[in-house]
Amino acid sequence: MIKQALLSVSDKTGIVDFARELNALGVTLLSTGGTAKLLAEAGLPVTEVADYTGFPEMLDGRVKTLHPKVHGGILARRDLPEHMAALAEHNIPTIDLLVVNLYPFQQTVAKDDCTLPDAIENIDIGGPTMLRSAAKNHRDVTVIVDPADYAVVLGEMRANGNSVGYDTNFRLATKVFAHTAQYDGAITNYLTSLGADKSHQARSAYPQTLNLAFEKVQEMRYGENPHQSAAFYRDLKAFDGALANYVQLQGKELSYNNIADADAAWECVKSFDAANSAACVIIKHANPCGVAVGANALEAYDKAFKTDSTSAFGGIIAFNVELDEAAAQAVAKQFVEVLIAPSFSAAARNVFAAKQNVRLLEIPLGKGVNQYDLKRVGGGLLVQGPDARNVQPSELRVVTRRHPTPKEMDDLMFAWRVAKFVKSNAIVFCGNGMTLGVGAGQMSRVDSARIASIKAQNAGLTLAGSAVASDAFFPFRDGLDVVVDAGATCVIQPGGSMRDDEVIAAADERGIAMVLTGTRHFRH
């Protein structure tokens, strides 16, 4: 039964209303510093911890709650007579509810003008200590670190005579340990990122000790293959527009492969500006098999589907605009696993109401990217920054005698945008705002070029006058000859080969335009 609560929070969201409800339930309120002042100004009866312990705050507030009268009241097991006798001997009442959140360390170090002393002063000591004490003794103490849990605790107290059930206390305790682990991890990440001069501005993006925090969204029936177990975890700092922020409107539970492919589709389609045109991306095995832009979702889908209607079967489809009824009716004619869009019209939802196995994911558009790109290797972890480099037309270097026409330049930029999301070695034929042939994942670039041209031929699409993007340089002229023989009139590639001069000379010999980006987009 909760008789006494200690409240000490940095995030004061909802704390006054919560304390008012506790007071109405007859709970004695203890508090510290700014929280105590806020509660007193709201007219609530509150006792300062310094008055409660008989020991004043000291060292500029560094020592406030580090006192036996606080921690004894939290840690004492109510089922052990010797613990309760010790409390009675030293006149220590129990503290049955602890509400604490911590100094804003991560927000502090995110500021450009932060200094090491600023960071150090925002390392909370008393807060984590109390939280861990309460979480350890969760059988007897309710502990709250998140304002979102205020309503849950109040509901149980009202229903159970000021008591909170063990299951809730256990859940709240695990939340505390996750929170303090993340907090300490953030401190370690920051401190071990500082160089010899301890400069905040010169800190490394890659700390000596890397702590990452994720929370489980779901366990899955299996992983990439049926014999593998799997789960999906969400980054606690997931950026705006991240796949992990999806809302599933209908459909079966997402599988491991669904999520992997959906992420590839969503990241690719987000790279197209919805303010300029609707875009549609169709993904199969993490590779785009059709990408297009159009005046609306239907036009974009029709063009993307034409690239490779065979591979689109059972694929993942993403749009960067609302999916309306017309596009939904076209998509519904095919077998699709997952549909992703910023929103779905009511009419589009009705189209898929009869196809409840189709998974509809709604995700708000956003420009953010993951802080790190991670890849596990045996006994280790490869960590890199995201491939977020977007080349602008003004940055391209024309290296051939013939310059691209304005239309060719548009096609080249489209092709380059798509090639970034195709597994290496990647060759992409494009024209008129759509992919025409995609060659992905081959060990030699010339084979990717051949496959891309064959795919276009199989789809009945002409490559005459098309633009080609290569995610990395052409090591020899053979790949270039393949795409020109197929009908390409312009090529975009990073450059950087020892044989660049030979490849450029071949382009001039064949009468095509070639531009270099200076940026490679390997994707493995």
UniProtKB/Swiss-Prot annotation:
Entry's Gene Ontology molecular function annotations: IMP cyclohydrolase activity; phosphoribosylaminoimidazolecarboxamide formyltransferase activity
Listed pathway(s): Purine metabolism; IMP biosynthesis via de novo pathway; 5-formamido-1-(5-phospho-D-ribosyl)imidazole-4-carboxamide from 5-amino-1-(5-phospho-D-ribosyl)imidazole-4-carboxamide (10-formyl THF route): step 1/1; Purine metabolism; IMP biosynthesis via de novo pathway; IMP from 5-formamido-1-(5-phospho-D-ribosyl)imidazole-4-carboxamide: step 1/1
Domain MGS-like, first and last residues per copy: 1-145
Superkingdom, taxonomy of origin: Bacteria
Reaction catalysis annotation: (6R)-10-formyltetrahydrofolate + 5-amino-1-(5-phospho-beta-D-ribosyl)imidazole-4-carboxamide = 5-formamido-1-(5-phospho-D-ribosyl)imidazole-4-carboxamide + (6S)-5,6,7,8-tetrahydrofolate; IMP + H2O = 5-formamido-1-(5-phospho-D-ribosyl)imidazole-4-carboxamide
GO terms for cellular component: cytosol
Keywords assigned: Hydrolase, Multifunctional enzyme, Purine biosynthesis, Transferase
GO biological process: 'de novo' IMP biosynthetic process
InterPro entries (alphabetical): AICAR_Tfase_dup_dom_sf (IPR024051), Cytidine_deaminase-like (IPR016193), MGS-like_dom (IPR011607), MGS-like_dom_sf (IPR036914), PurH-like (IPR002695)
Record EC number: 2.1.2.3, 3.5.4.10
Protein family membership: Belongs to the PurH family.
Record's comment describing the protein's domains: The IMP cyclohydrolase activity resides in the N-terminal region.
Protein name according to UniProt: Bifunctional purine biosynthesis protein PurH
Gene from which this protein is expressed: purH
